[in-house]
């Protein structure tokens, strides 16, 4: 397993349309292992293969990226002090994913992206989706998804079409986000 470099805007590869996976082999398994390691290291909750420079229709998602062996996390807010139990990892792999049935009802989540670091914006997407995908063995799965999982899968699937979350923003908001990113890079 290896941590791969995450490509960032304005890298033109991020605008590339990814191609379907046809070979479910050891090379694919290695890619997926590397993607999880890269995503956890970043840290993030989702990663598309194109974000590590591989134009294949492969996504990894884990909405529970915390280390299960970690000590409870101390938290202070609203004058209260308490501890959170760390959550367990739930790694999921989506190969050649498709959205079959997006709802007409929409929800808004604040999104960020490992390829657009330090930038966050509210994006509106279908609240529920029916998704179909293949696993590492090529077996087909189908599932109804909602909430953060539906949003995250749609965000990652956008990468497969060369679309970034900032592309869903108005031109003004997108330009402001890109200027902010440029400033952050100059300051670093």
From Swiss-Prot:
Family membership noted in the UniProt record: Belongs to the polypeptide deformylase family.
PANTHER family, alphabetized: PEPTIDE DEFORMYLASE
Pfam families, per the entry: Pep_deformylase
UniProt enzyme class: hydrolase
E.C. code: 3.5.1.88
Positions of the catalytic residues: 156
Residue positions binding Fe cation: 113, 155, 159
Region entry Disordered, spans: 70-90
Cofactor note: Binds 1 Fe(2+) ion.
InterPro entries reported for this sequence: Peptide_deformylase (IPR023635), Peptide_deformylase_sf (IPR036821)
Molecular-function GO term, any one: metal ion binding
Requisite cofactors: Fe(2+)
Source lineage: Bacteria, Pseudomonadati, Pseudomonadota, Alphaproteobacteria, Sphingomonadales
Protein name in the entry: Peptide deformylase
HAMAP family: Pep_deformylase
Single GO biological process annotation from the record: co-translational protein modification
Function (record text): Removes the formyl group from the N-terminal Met of newly synthesized proteins. Requires at least a dipeptide for an efficient rate of reaction. N-terminal L-methionine is a prerequisite for activity but the enzyme has broad specificity at other positions.
Keyword annotations from UniProtKB, A to Z: Hydrolase, Iron, Metal-binding, Protein biosynthesis
Catalytically driven reaction(s): N-terminal N-formyl-L-methionyl-[peptide] + H2O = N-terminal L-methionyl-[peptide] + formate
Keyword Nuclease: no
